[in-house]
């Protein structure tokens, strides 16, 4: 009988944990299930690489002072943090959504100008995803700068919004 009670408790605790994780991700303003799926197999990617729309990358960051930012980040990175610069080819329609596994600032630059975000959602209770930011751009090349990260790696997904 004692084993049955312990087994039931373990099942209920596991179900509660799974529900809590789902509830944490539900707090985002838009779904992040695609990012969660992509992050599990994100390939290691060096700073300076091109990020593909519809994919994720496990981006290697460098000390912020060595990142080679095209423009100074809108939010100055704290001492001892990491950053990177990457490029993306924005598809027709121009809307992209950049989601991150951890805390970092995102700046998008197109035609030499910093582009303000069109939407932001961030939660601390979703496993593996910290923030998701939307931008409305012109089709064509853009630069994405990541700064202020506390770790030297960051999973990044670039998607078209659902």
Regions flagged by a language model, labelled:
Residues 1-8:
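Bacterial N-terminal signal peptides that target proteins for export
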Residues 8-12, 56:
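Generic hydrophobic/packing signal
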Residues 13-20:
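N-terminal signal peptide c-region/cleavage motif recognized by signal peptidases
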Residues 21-162:
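Acidic, Ser/Thr/Pro
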């Amino acid at each position: 009988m004692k084993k049955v009670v312990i087994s039931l408790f373990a099942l209920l605790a596991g179900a509660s944990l799974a529900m809590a994780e789902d509830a944490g991700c539900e707090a985002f303003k838009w779904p992040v299930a695609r990012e969660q799926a992509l992050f599990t197999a994100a390939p290691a990617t060096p700073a300076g690489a091109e990020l593909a729309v519809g994919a994720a990358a496990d981006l290697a960051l460098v000390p912020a002072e060595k990142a080679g930012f095209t423009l100074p980040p809108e939010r100055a990175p704290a001492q001892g943090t990491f950053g990177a610069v990457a490029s993306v080819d924005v598809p027709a329609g121009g809307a992209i959504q950049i989601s991150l596994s951890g805390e970092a600032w995102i700046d998008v630059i197109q035609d030499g100008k910093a582009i303000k975000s069109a939407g932001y959602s961030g939660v601390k209770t979703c496993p593996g995803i910290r923030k998701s930011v939307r931008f409305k751009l012109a089709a064509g090349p853009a630069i994405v700068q990541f700064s202020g990260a506390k770790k030297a790696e960051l999973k990044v997904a670039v998607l078209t919004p659902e």
